[in-house]
Structures are given as structure tokens and as C-alpha cells.
Amino acid sequence: MGAATSALNRRQLDQFEKIRLRPNGKKKYQIKHLIWAGKEMERFGLHERLLETEEGCKRIIEVLYPLEPTGSEGLKSLFNLVCVLYCLHKEQKVKDTEEAVATVRQHCHLVEKEKSATETSSGQKKNDKGIAAPPGCSQNFPAQQQGNAWVHVPLSPRTLNAWVKAVEEKKFGAEIVPMFQALSEGCTPYDINQMLNVLGDHQGALQIVKEIINEEAAQWDVTHPLPAGPLPAGQLRDPRGSDIAGTTSSVQEQLEWIYTANPRVDVGAIYRRWIILGLQKCVKMYNPVSVLDIRQGPKEPFKDYVDRFYKAIRAEQASGEVKQWMTESLLIQNANPDCKVILKGLGMHPTLEEMLTACQGVGGPSYKAKVMAEMMQTMQNQNMVQQGGPKRQRPPLRCYNCGKFGHMQRQCPEPRKTKCLKCGKLGHLAKDCRGQVNFLGYGRWMGAKPRNFPAATLGAEPSAPPPPSGTTPYDPAKKLLQQYAEKGKQLREQKRNPPAMNPDWTEGYSLNSLFGEDQ
């Protein structure tokens, strides 16, 4: 877009920067949005100079409007931006994107066109120009006859949107090849190239498809050489490999080769086969798992295993006979042991319906419980064989209170008896038993012998002189006790007979000495 702002002049650019992205929002449009829109136009095969005029923006809106309801976030953003530019070129004052989209719907009559397109696809067989479609063909047929000439009708945006959405979701899975076959039925090389050009995120896969196209085109040139000498006047030339690929041929030449040439050369069908070969190679590259590696897990349901198996079979590039042999041999061979036992019991060449019905309960809760019960029974039988038979039976219960069999002490109806566990006598407990205790406190129930203490030496004499005869030995505690007794006796006597008060002391401390005769 040149300086990236050539789509708008200075006055329009000032108005553009005042329009809000959302109603009552803070963010507004900037120049970087125009630069982004110019780059996004190339993904849809549109020139960026269409943004510079009102008519160009209208054409962009007509292309993007059918894709907008189911398109990606980038496509919706581009559609909203083009609506804002259309209002600026139309000199319609808008405040935000939502108001601009509503204005475009009103001025371009998009709602009415959508209703008429729905009615036409449901029952009508004529387009807006009054051109009748060929018998047995819908309005999306890529070529329509007008008089004696064939007119090319481009692919519907809905078809392109369905193709792009399928590639984005499946990532060149096994479903892409039949999807391409359905959407490209009856298309010209120009239409097929348009379907490939709208894929922008898978250039590695498209490069593989281009290599296959170049190889097939070179092989076509070898097997179909040019005739010697110049062509007669008015005769259509034979298509070359590059003509079939749509690089050196026009749309009108492709229509003439398909419909009016003698002999006819269906360049669209030939180019379609080349694309399918390339897509099959891409599918094999994006799905490296071979059908030989598909095995049923120990807990996987048989239905899920069959789905994975046939998906891998679908991605295999082999003939129908080879796929049939792989299905008959590998489907049962790669099943888990439980399903394999059931499938082998069905006989030779069972149908898929019979196999699914027979293995329907394998892997479910009831089947797992049944298998677990059988395993536990088997393990129990093995343990009994290893242990050498059942264990010896225990003797009958005996009461410790009454000595009878058949019940325990806590269930005994007779009164509880107190019995010593040391001597075996009744009437006392073991802690009170003295019949088994000697003079040292050692009984039979103790775990060790009493310790030995050194005995006092007989005949040892004290070193101090003996006290005089007739006197008691000196005891300091006894003497101290006598002193305390005497002191207590004195205190009791003083309390009983307090001393008399001294008159001199009373006079010396009376108030008369302070005030004298004033009292």
C-alpha cells in the first residue's frame, strides 16, 4: 500500500484515528491497522489498492461477507476494518466499528442479497443475470453455457470457506482427500489453484503437492508430444503439462479444452488427479503411523480399535485388494487376547457386524468383574494346593471363671471369682499375695534375685572414748527440742500475765507536755 497510509488522505486519516474499536471503548484505530489489512488482502487473492476507493471496498465486502459468520478472528477483523474504510470513503460519520458494520449492511443491501441467495439455492435454477444453468448442475457449477459460448462461474466463497476450515481442523488427515474430491468436482484448473492459494499456513504440504504436479506435468509432456508442423488456422492447440496446471493457460482456453475441443481434454479432471496424488502423500507424511502398528490395548473397547484401524487403512496408499487383505488378516491378528479368543470362535471370514456384536461387552464393567472373579477363584485354588489342605481346627472355647466349655469369661452367668495368679488361691489378687514372698521381698514371680549388700563387721569398736557410766549419750536434737519447749513456755506466760504500764512513760508521752495549760 505504498506508504501504508495511501488508502486514506490526511482528513480521512484523522477521522479514522477517532473511530473506536468497540462501543464505549478506549482503544481507537491506528495506522498499524491499515498496514495489517494490506498484508491480509494477499491471503484472499485481493489487491491492496482496492482499499483506496469506495468501489474497491464494496467489492472486498462482497467477497468477505459470506465468510464472516463462520470465519476466523482475523477474517472478522478484516471485514470490520473494510466496513470502516467504506464509511470513510462514503463520508458517513461513524463512532465505532459496530456502527460502521450496520451502515454497510444498510447501504450495500447485504441482508436482502443473503435472502435472495438462500431462495435461489433452495429452489431456483437461474442466477441474477438470467443465465440458465446446465441440466443436472447446480448454480455453483464452474461453467455455464450462454448461447454458444461457455462462461466461467467462480467458486462460491462458502465452498472456499468449507475447504479452509476442513484443512485447519483436520491438519491433512485421512479425511482431506475425500473432502477435496467433493469440493472440486467439475472444477477447472483455475478453480483448483484458487482452492490451494487460500491455504496460507501449510506451505510445507503445498510444496510437496507442487513437486508432484511438476513430476506429473513432465510425464504428460513425454507421453503427449507436440504434433509436427504448424497448426491449421482456427484449431485449438493441444494442452501441455503447464497448461493443465493452469500456469500457461487462460480460463477461456481451459473451458474450450473441456467442452468444445475435438477431441475433448478434461484438463480439470487431469489436474484434479495430480492434486489428489499430492494430498495423499501429504496425508502419509502427516500420519506416519502404519496400519501394521495399530494394535488394540488391553482395556480398549473393540469399537474404538476398529475406528483407529480403518482410519489407518484409509490413509494407506494401496489398492483395494491390498486393503481388503490387510483388513481380513490384521484386524483379528492385532486384537487383544480377550477379543482374539472371541473372534476366532466366529469361524472363517466373519463380517464386521458379527465381530462388533461378539466383542461388544469386552472391556466393560461387567466383563471386567467376571474376569476378576475367575482370576481370584484360580488364585485361591492354587493357594490351597500349595498350603497342603485346610488348617487344623481350633479347640472349643473354655471359660476361665467356671472352667466349662462353650463360652468365655465375659459371657459366664456365674458370679465372678477372685483368684490369685501367683499362688492359685481364691480370695485375693496377685498384688496382695504374700504366700510366695520371702523375708527379703523376693518371690517366685520376680525375674531376678535380690542384690547383695555388704554386712557390718562384727567386733568393730568405735575410736571415741565411751561415755561415763550412768549417763545417757549426748543427743543434739533432743537438747534443741528442750530449748524450743522452754521458749514456748515463756511466751505463753507473758501472754497470760502482761507487764504493768510504767507511769513515767505515760506522762512523758502524753499530750499535756505539748499544750501545757491551754487544755
Curated annotation (Swiss-Prot):
Q: InterPro entries in the record, alphabetically?
A: Gag_p24_C, Lentvrl_matrix_N, Matrix_HIV/RSV_N, Primate_lentivir_Gag_pol-like, Retrov_capsid_C, Retrov_capsid_N, Retrovr_matrix, Znf_CCHC
User: Zn-finger regions (CCHC-type) at which positions?
Assistant: 397-414, 418-435
The UniProt record lists lipidation (N-myristoyl glycine) at 2
Function as written in the Swiss-Prot or TrEMBL entry = Matrix protein p17 targets Gag and Gag-Pol polyproteins to the plasma membrane via a multipartite membrane binding signal, that includes its myristoylated N-terminus. Also mediates nuclear localization of the preintegration complex. Implicated in the release from host cell mediated by Vpu. Capsid protein p24 forms the conical core of the virus that encapsulates the genomic RNA-nucleocapsid complex.
Q: Which UniProt keywords apply?
A: Capsid protein, Host cytoplasm, Host nucleus, Host-virus interaction, Lipoprotein, Metal-binding, Myristate, Phosphoprotein, Repeat, RNA-binding, Viral budding, Viral budding via the host ESCRT complexes, Viral nucleoprotein, Viral release from host cell, Virion, Zinc, Zinc-finger
As one GO molecular function, the record gives: zinc ion binding
Write out the residue ranges of the motif Nuclear localization signal: 26-32
Anything else the record notes?
A: This is an African green monkey isolate.
Return the protein name.
Answer: Gag polyprotein
Q: What is known of its domains?
A: Late-budding domains (L domains) are short sequence motifs essential for viral particle budding. They recruit proteins of the host ESCRT machinery (Endosomal Sorting Complex Required for Transport) or ESCRT-associated proteins. p6-gag contains one L domain: a PTAP/PSAP motif, which interacts with the UEV domain of TSG101.
Q: Which modifications occur after translation, per UniProt?
A: Capsid protein p24 is phosphorylated. Specific enzymatic cleavages by the viral protease yield mature proteins. The polyprotein is cleaved during and after budding, this process is termed maturation.
Residue spans with biased composition (Basic and acidic residues)?
A: 486-496
Q: Which family does it belong to?
A: Belongs to the primate lentivirus group gag polyprotein family.
Span(s) of short sequence motif Nuclear export signal:
16-22
| Stored SMART domains | ZnF_C2HC
Q: Where is this motif: PTAP/PSAP motif?
A: 462-465
Annotated GO biological processes are: viral budding via host ESCRT complex; viral translational frameshifting
Residues of the site described as Cleavage: 438-439
